[in-house]
Amino acid sequence: MLEAAGLEVHSGDVTDASSLRGAGSGMEVAYFLVHSMGGGVGFAEREQLGARNFAQMARREGVERVVYLGGLGDETTSKHLRSRHETALALAAEGPPLTYFRAAMVVGAGSESYRTLRYLVGRLPVMITPAWLRTATQPIGIDATVEYLRRAPDVPESEGREVQIGGPDVLTYGEMLDRMALAMGKRPRPKLPVPLITPWLSALWLGLVTPVDTRVARPLVEGLRTATVVTDPSGAEPFEISPASFDEMLRRALAEEAEQ
């Protein structure tokens, strides 16, 4: 498909530096949108290796800017969030100037976060509510996220800095589940508080009732225990983008799924 559109495809593995030779030839901007959570144990180490190899390739081959999408939140509270942040540090240390976007949940048809919400609402008549369902987050739609990434090379203020992005709504995960139910034409699900459930049990629960692999679910659940909201909007201001509301994100995602 990409070749048919006149694009050149370079296949490689970011953990194998030799496979990246020539990947950045002729490029001005390179996007690093790689994560290794699905690989289970050791995903953080693989991410750092991949980031270093990619950054070194970009610098060696004359790439002028690297753009990376990481996560919002206090990176000291979760191995998942810490790995996202350390990946940015590796890219900045080893490569060209970095634009480091940080986002919470990205909502769009096909995204893991969206699918998890939809499956929880669609499959469970009653929902157990671990403490993390009361954590605040600031979701952003896939359309706005892609637009931030696309505009980055044309926004000089974003070079060499962190850019926190989010939609207009700050919600708890429980509130997002209720809004998903309403968007699907269902009543919000009754909730059964289970305050002492561990991240491991939460991940197992998600793995049983949603398509999310338990190996992916556990680091995600660990990250859900900390608030993921924009604390410094200044980096996003030069982009002049107005992300959609959470309800509009859901409407678009459900409509796109219905068309598939």
Language-model segments: residues:
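A short helix->loop->beta-strand "cap" motif at the edges of active sites that frequently abuts
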Residues: R60-R65, G95-P96
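SDR active-site strand-loop-helix element
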Residues: L33-V34, V66-G71, F101-A103
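Mid/C-terminal beta-alpha module of Rossmann-like enzyme folds, strongest
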Residues: Y148-P219, A227-Q260
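Conserved cofactor-binding/catalytic machinery of classical short-chain dehydrogenase/reductase
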Residues: D16, G50-N53, R65, T87, ...
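NAD(P)H-binding glycine-rich loop region in Rossmannoid oxidoreductase-like domains
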Residues: M1-E61, G71-E75
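Oxidoreductase cofactor-interface core, primarily capturing Rossmann-like NAD(P)-dependent enzymes
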Residues: E75-K186
